[in-house]
């Protein structure tokens, strides 16, 4: 259906015809598409109405990224974007194509048979939203897309935007109404698609990315010996500078587990935030003395109405001193000013660091005032601390440039195991671990629940996963297997069956954990048990047992104090604005998209220290799940280049035990972490993250990952993302780091002959461990690289058992080979793809 192509050329082979004439990147991009339309598999009618949606210029490499939107009959094609990456001299280094080929044939005879109002009612019904007032038309255009603004109908936080789009499917294109609905509470920000002719609901995208533990394997939560937060009796940690002061867990600290807070002064970066963090008018002097400014407004939203709680933005006074007490032995409600201050600080840090590496005004960053530097303003982040709409979660909703994103940070319930007591049969009588879910009622509120445990059968294989409605005997406790659908779906089905509680059995080895998810209609408690305990229970059914509260009164933990979680969520905004350009946020809704991976990786990169090593285990979210800093975190394994600890490869993407999108992102972040360490080993580590990419391998890695998101096509897969980083290195350094990059990806199965298949399908990729032949003998510093760089993933020609892993243990060989291919051309849906090994 779509001509999915990545076209790459060596920069020396495509240059401007006349370098004395100023380069117009937009015209270069238009001309490129016209000249290469046949290579792209596109008919004249496919490109006849293309429009410029965004133009993003990158300072460090001089590349201008031009994003062209496909239209037909005056109506945009959803995700139909060609991105053309133009060098300073007018050369085209690469182009990514997501236009629909031969659209005229599929679009003919489709007509509008439903109004925007009718579509709104149909969308509400499908999304289980109940309008409390009629939908009214507030504005309507006379253009072909019939863009319409509707009243909220009581289901949205504000007006609902609707317009006609062409929606590509697997084999055709449909004329649809797209409605943008931000649900009250902010848990979901839907793009809903309904057939414009029939009103049939065709699908939805959620612009809110969630960081729940739902469908993720992790180690058991355990108490740590971290800081209790009593660090506010003096100015220890004061960095001595003048200006605004914030007592926080500063860069690169991750959480209270790393030690006491410090009072940092004047941390704003002068390039990114030239008038400080409390300015909005571009004139020296703050407009706000609260936790609000050009980049973010931080506050609490305990009542979950998406409006700041009264007085919840701490006031630093005329001196802008934000120094508030923190006692972690108390519940989060007792230290709100300290939590909001930390959230404000880290949102600004993310803004300023990302700005340094290219997420600036023209790229669609988040600012009220763009200070005349391009882009669309009035879109600072609304950072909501201790949001009351959920638990054990965090999220970030990203609209297009010019509309304010929303970050929601939640409290995390203690995951200390709740005792499940089995009374009978006697051979297995005893107490079992069962951490309570982060959604639904608390066992501390309901009290102990006793019943007969029965295995569910929902009638659809695998019948015990509870993903379909089921029935259970009155008074029983349903036992449900993990897998295939969200935890909240399983528990909601149990509630609908009349159960007072539910037990979910893990489907992978390891300890149980506190399940995450958001569904405020779930009113029963639920717990998880391990796979081993689940097998034991199932072998001894029916059994009787009691589930009771076992948290021991531990206070909840506040994700506002975990900078890794904050950085993860903020990066969702970065990746959504950079991929496909800031005028669209519909480019990371495909099955193989890597959004969760970039978010994990930035959390790792910003909290890395010079004492870290490539084999140092790094868990994500360890603080909020009551683990020590070296805990496994909320992913299947901690991040490390040690294959014995983190064995994920490209083939893992197709493993149904790996969740979508978090598990897929975990695989991508693992690959990026390999690249990060190859570059750090080669170029060293810079303690100053604001220095340019030449200062250290960590800075270089951030620059390449950020640039790669601009280079890659809309709706990328893993191969697209790898190629984009290679092209970014060509533009930045002439390809000098190509082999470090190739080795990283090839070690994890994304070598030169890896096949992505469709980026809309996570199951059709083929891994490969080959690198270009030019990368076999190019090392200048072989003594600085251990076997981790050239084995256990197929770097070089290896015999079995011929090298050691990161811990000095022998690694089984992989039979890897070296690819002699440096340039190869293949055809995908009629589009030629030229892959070039970057020059060295």
Region spans (language model):
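Bacterial N-terminal signal peptides
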Residues: 1-9
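Segments that shape or occlude catalytic/ligand-binding pockets
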Residues: 12-229, 238-256, 324-328, 353-412
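Second-shell loop/turn segments in exported
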Residues: 17-22, 71-73, 103-113, 166, ...
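Zinc-dependent metallohydrolase catalytic domains
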Residues: 143-147, 289-292, 300, 333-336, ...
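Secretory-pathway-linked proteins and extracytosolic
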Residues: 184-348, 634-636
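Ser/Thr/Gly/Pro-rich low-complexity, disordered linker/stalk segments of secreted
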Residues: 223-238, 777-817
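Structured lumen-facing ectodomains of secretory-pathway proteins
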Residues: 415-555, 576
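Short, solvent-exposed loop/edge segments of extracellular or virion-exposed proteins
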Residues: 424-436, 797-798, 819-835
């Amino acid at each position: 259906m779509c001509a999915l192509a990545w076209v790459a050329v060596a920069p020396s082979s495509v240059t401007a015809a006349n370098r004395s004439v100023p380069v117009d990147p937009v015209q270069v991009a238009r001309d490129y598409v016209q000249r290469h339309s046949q290579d792209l598999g596109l008919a004249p009618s496919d490109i006849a109405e293309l429009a410029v949606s965004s133009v993003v210029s990158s300072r460090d490499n001089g590349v201008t990224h031009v994003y062209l939107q496909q239209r037909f009959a005056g109506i945009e094609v959803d995700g139909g974007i060609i991105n053309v990456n133009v060098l300073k001299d007018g050369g085209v280094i690469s182009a990514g194509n997501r236009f629909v080929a031969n659209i005229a044939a599929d679009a003919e005879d489709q007509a509008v048979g439903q109004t925007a109002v009718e579509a709104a009612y149909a969308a509400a019904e499908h999304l289980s939203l109940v309008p409390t007032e009629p939908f009214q038309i507030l504005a309507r255009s006379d253009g072909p897309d019939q863009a319409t603004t509707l009243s909220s109908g009581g289901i949205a936080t504000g007006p609902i935007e609707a317009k006609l789009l062409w929606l590509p499917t697997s084999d055709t294109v449909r004329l649809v109404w797209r409605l943008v609905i931000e649900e009250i509470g902010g848990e979901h920000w839907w793009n809903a698609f309904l057939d414009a002719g029939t009103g049939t609901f065709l699908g939805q995208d959620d612009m809110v990315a969630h960081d729940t533990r739902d469908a993720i394997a992790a180690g058991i939560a355990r108490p740590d010996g971290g800081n209790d937060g009593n660090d506010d009796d003096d100015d220890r940690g004061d960095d001595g500078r003048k200006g605004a002061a914030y007592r926080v867990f500063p860069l690169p600290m991750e959480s209270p587990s790393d030690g006491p807070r410090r009072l940092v002064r004047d941390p704003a970066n002068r390039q990114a935030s030239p008038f400080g963090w409390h300015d909005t008018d571009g004139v020296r002097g703050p407009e706000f003395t609260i936790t609000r400014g050009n980049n973010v407004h931080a506050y609490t939203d305990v009542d979950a109405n998406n409006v700041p709680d009264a007085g919840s933005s701490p006031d630093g006074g005329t001196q802008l001193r934000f120094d508030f007490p923190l006692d972690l032995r108390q519940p989060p409600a007792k230290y709100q000013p300290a939590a909001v201050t930390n959230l404000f600080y880290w949102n600004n840090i993310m803004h300023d660091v990302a700005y340094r590496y290219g997420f600036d005004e023209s790229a669609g960053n988040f600012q009220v005032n763009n200070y005349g530097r391009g882009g669309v303003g009035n879109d600072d982040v609304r950072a909501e601390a201790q949001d009351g709409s959920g638990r054990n979660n965090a999220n970030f909703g990203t609209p297009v440039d010019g509309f304010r994103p929303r970050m929601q940070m939640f409290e995390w319930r203690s995951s200390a195991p709740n005792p499940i007591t089995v009374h009978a049969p006697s051979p297995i009588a005893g107490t079992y671990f069962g951490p309570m879910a982060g959604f639904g009622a608390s066992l501390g509120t309901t009290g102990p629940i006793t019943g007969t445990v029965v295995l569910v059968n929902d009638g659809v294989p695998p019948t015990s996963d509870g993903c379909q409605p089921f029935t259970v005997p009155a008074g029983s406790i349903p036992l449900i297997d993990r897998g295939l659908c969200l935890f909240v779906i399983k528990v909601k089905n149990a509630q609908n069956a009349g159960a007072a509680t539910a037990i979910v059995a893990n489907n992978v080895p390891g300890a149980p954990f506190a399940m995450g998810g958001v569904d405020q209609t779930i009113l029963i408690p639920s717990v998880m048990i391990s796979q081993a305990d689940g097998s034991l229970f199932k072998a001894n059914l029916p059994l009787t047992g009691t589930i009771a509260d076992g948290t021991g009164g531990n206070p909840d933990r506040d994700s506002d104090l975990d900078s890794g979680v904050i950085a993860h969520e903020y990066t969702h905004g970065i990746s959504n604005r950079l991929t496909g350009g800031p005028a669209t946020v519909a480019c990371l809704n495909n099955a193989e998209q890597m959004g969760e991976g970039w978010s994990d990786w930035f959390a790792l990169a910003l909290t890395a220290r010079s004492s870290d090593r490539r084999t140092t285990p790094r868990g994500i979210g360890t603080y909020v799940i009551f683990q020590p800093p070296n805990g496994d975190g909320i992913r299947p394994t901690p991040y490390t280049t040690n294959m014995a600890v983190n064995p994920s490869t490209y083939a893992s993407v197709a493993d149904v035990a790996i969740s979508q999108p978090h598990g897929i992102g975990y695989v991508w972040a693992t690959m990026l972490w390999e690249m990060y360490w190859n570059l750090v080993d080669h170029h060293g580590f810079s303690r100053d993250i604001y220095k340019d990419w030449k200062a250290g391998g960590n800075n270089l890695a951030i620059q390449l990952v950020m640039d790669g998101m601009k280079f890659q096509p809309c709706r990328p897969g893993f191969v697209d993302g790898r190629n984009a980083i290679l092209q970014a290195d060509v533009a930045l350094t002439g390809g000098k780091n190509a082999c470090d990059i190739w080795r990283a990806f090839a070690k994890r199965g994304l070598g030169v002959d890896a096949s992505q298949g469709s980026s809309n399908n996570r199951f059709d990729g083929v891994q490969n461990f080959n690198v270009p032949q030019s990368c076999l003998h190019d090392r200048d510093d072989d003594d600085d690289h251990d076997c981790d760089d050239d084995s256990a993933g197929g770097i070089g020609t290896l015999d079995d058992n011929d090298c050691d892993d990161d811990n000095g243990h022998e690694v089984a060989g992989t039979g890897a080979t070296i690819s002699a291919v440096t340039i190869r051309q293949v055809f995908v849906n009629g589009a030629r793809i030229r892959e070039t090994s970057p020059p060295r």
